[in-house]
Amino acid sequence: MEENSKSVLTESQVAAFNERGYLVADFSLNESMLDAIVEKVQPLYPEDYQQNPTLPARVQDAWKSIDEVRQLARDMSIAQALQQLVGRQSLPFQTLNFPIGTRQFTHSDTVHFNSIPSNYMAGVWVALEDIDEDNGPLLYYPGSHKLHEYSMHDFDLEPGYHNYHKYEECIQKVIER
């Protein structure tokens, strides 16, 4: 870790992350910034979503056009926490915004993007809507970060979106073992 890096997490938080593979942390993010993100991203959702908000929608890489998203992606406290957790400086490279929770099935983000060396990809999720256990929280399986990285090829599936649901089913079976 670099000498000028600051510890923002306790030793017990780091140990919990190493054991479970995820960490819930409060970085006291600026609420005005978060509200501005919601407001400024809203018009970027596709027209079909604007007409029917029950349809799934997302905006990828809003950090390229919205200052507040870029500010969040580069938040120093989050970057310092990531450095404590993985022992390397982080490089934010993608943002995904959703108007509401995505209702995704069990999956591994490494099928979408990865890192070299492997096992250094970390995702940061910031809820921009109020959530609780009844309305769509993010679900992690404790310890799943210690599993093998599975690609579609590992399940004899041809790569591509047409096999994504089958991939999710295979990942769910691995998790349930």
Where are these regions (language model features)?
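Short, structured patches in soluble enzyme cores that scaffold and shape functional sites
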Residues: 108-110, 126-130, 142
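Short beta-strand segments in beta-sandwich/barrel cores
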Residues: 23, 130, 138
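Residues in well-ordered beta-strands of folded domains
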Residues: 93-99, 125, 139-141
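Short, conserved beta-strand element in jelly-roll/cupin
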Residues: 116-133
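Generic structural motif
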Residues: 32, 44, 129-131, 143
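Non-heme Fe(II)-dependent double-stranded beta-helix
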Residues: 1-20, 24-117, 153
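Double-stranded beta-helix
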Residues: 134-177
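A structural signal for well-ordered alpha-helical scaffolds and beta->alpha junctions
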Residues: 10, 75, 79, 121, ...
